[in-house]
Design a protein with these regions (language model features):
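Phosphate- and other anionic-substrate recognition elements at nucleic-acid/protein interfaces
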Residues: 1-181
């Protein structure tokens, strides 16, 4: 697990002479990075919202490719956090077997955009491995395992995770839950 914190002088506003507020991370953002990923907001363990990763379509090598939209991500993060003390939990990812160089570069770019937006907004971020958050959440392995676990935990929001392609949403929720533990 890797954690990057904002320097305390920037993170803790002064309340009075020599007193600093103690951050209370009741708002946790879970991030499944990549163009097919998602962002979830939990407040005191309650799922408040989940959003597909903002993307933009660009032309690369004469074909259309989706990639994370920096401006869209910044606007979304701002709308989720506002002035509240928040922490972010992002999946720590590495190269996957059989993944091409171009694909790895694109994915790394997405993670860099996420890290940059969080740093600019002074939101501390912790990176957790997939194995770590899956174990903490009790989800079975695989895309359907995450979706099933989230639907068990949040049955009233099950419609948000009904499609197979909603696995990124489910992962983001479980990542946030793992970070709130």
């Amino acid at each position: 697990m890797t954690t990057y914190n904002v320097p305390q002088a920037m993170q803790l506003p002064t309340l009075g002479v020599g007193q600093a507020s103690t951050p209370s991370f009741s708002r946790v953002i879970g991030i499944d990075p990549g163009a097919s990923g998602a962002i979830a907001l939990l407040v005191q363990g309650v799922l408040l919202s989940v959003h597909d990763m903002p993307t933009v379509t660009v032309e690369r090598n004469k074909s259309q490719k989706r990639q994370v939209c920096p401006a869209g991500l910044s606007i979304l993060i701002e709308s989720l956090t506002g002035p509240y003390v928040t922490k972010a939990i992002c999946e720590k990812v590495g190269a996957r077997p059989g993944q091409g160089v171009s694909s790895m570069f694109s994915f790394g770019r997405s993670v860099g955009i996420i890290e940059g937006v969080l740093a600019a907004k002074q939101i501390p971020v912790t990176f957790v491995t997939p194995q770590s958050w899956q174990k903490l959440s009790g989800a079975a392995k695989g895309k359907d395992g995450s979706r099933q676990r989230v639907m068990e935990l949040f049955p009233r929001e099950a419609h948000l995770f009904a499609r197979v392609k909603d696995d990124g949403r489910a992962d983001a929720v479980l990542i946030a839950l793992a970070g709130g533990i």
